[in-house]
C-alpha cells in the first residue's frame, strides 16, 4: 500500500517558487530520505505533508485519500512530526512531554486514560527513556531531548513519521542513538518514515530510498547508491566534497586540500 503519492506539487512564497512540480511516491513501511542543499525545499515539503502549508498546485494523497479531506484530529492521529528544534521552555518531566502526544486521541487536558498511559509507556520503552520518565526535560542532553520528541510523536500512534533534521546539533554518539532508534521503529513496528536532512551520511544503512532535491526540483530518486553517485553530488555541491565507499555504503566528506 502507498503511504504517500505526490503529483505535480508546487509551492510558492512571496519571494519566489520553492517547490516545482514534485512527483514521487512512498510505500507503507518505507524509510525515505529527502536530501539537498539549503533552500532546496526540504522543510517546506514536510510542512505541506502535515498541512501547515497549502500547496499552490498539485495533489497529495495520504494512504489513498486526498490530504485536504482528512479531518484535523484524524490527521494528527495518522501523521506525527518531529521538528528540528527540540526546545522545551519549562521543566516538564519526560512523561508529561510524551503524554502531550496523546492529545489528538481525545484526552485533551483531562486525566489520561489507561490507553494513553499504555501508549506512553510503549513510546518510552521504544526510545529507551523509561528510566528518565520523571526527569525534567530541561536537564537532559541534546540527544536525550531529541529522543523525547521522538517518543512524543510515537505516543500519537501515527502511521507516518516525519523527521526534520533529526541529527542536527548532535554529537556523533547521540546521532548514532537517534538513528538506531529510528531504524528499530521501522524494522519492528513497520512505521513509515520520511526523514529530511542536510547530511547524506544518514542515508546508508537507514533509508530504503533517497530523494535528492535542488532548487525545489527532484534531481534524483532511487536507491541510496544511485543518489550518492559522486558526479551527481559534485554537480550540486561543487568540488568541495569527496565520496568514499564505507561498510554500510557510500559516505560523503568535505574535500580537504593536501597539506
Model-derived segments and their meaning:
Residues 161-165:
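Catalytic Walker B motif of ABC-type/P-loop ATPase nucleotide-binding domains
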Residues 58-66, 75:
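Conserved ABC transporter NBD signature motif
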Residues 35-37:
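The feature captures the beta-strand-to-loop junction immediately N-terminal to the Walker
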Residues 136-140, 144:
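Conserved ABC ATPase signature
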Residues 50:
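Helix-to-loop junction immediately C-terminal to a conserved catalytic motif
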Residues 99, 114-132:
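Conserved ABC ATPase "signature" region
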Residues 157:
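Conserved catalytic motifs of ABC-family nucleotide-binding domains
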